[in-house]
Amino acid sequence: FSEKPEIIDSTLMIIPDNHLISFSDNIPSVIPIEGFVSKRMEGVFSKVDNLHGGIDIVAKEGSPIKSTSAGVVVFSGWTYEMGNLIIIYHGDDYLTHYGHNQQNIVSRLDMVKKGDVIGLVGNTGISSGPHLHFEIWKGGKSIDPMIYFPEFLKKDLTLKK
């Protein structure tokens, strides 16, 4: 995702004591949406010009999107490329991105729990049909979500090279 909104400032890293996120809560472990993977992540060593920094999960438009772990919403808004986009900070340098949403249900600085519904699957921004574009970031680097959710390997519709 090339169009990065300025989302990190000192106020976003302050989490109230009564909303502390435990280590086990911040690791993505809840599937964000039931569906099929139509496009996989293309890493930095890919020979493709337009890298794909996450996975696309095809699902019925309007289906609920769940937070993969507890955290604070640091961005909930519109970008040209991702359309309606939600970015959640989970602590321990984890961020998750949920793009092309029909509707964002959460707002900036909302606290979410693992499994909370945060948005609805859509077809906004630069999109070829209803799906969720899902990314995991750790320490400023994009990580393949298939590592965290190997069950998607059984639902992978992408062409093998």
Label every PLM stretch briefly.
Residues 30-161:
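Catalytic cores of peptidoglycan-degrading enzymes
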Residues 1-44, 158-161:
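Polar/charged, compositionally biased leader and regulatory segments
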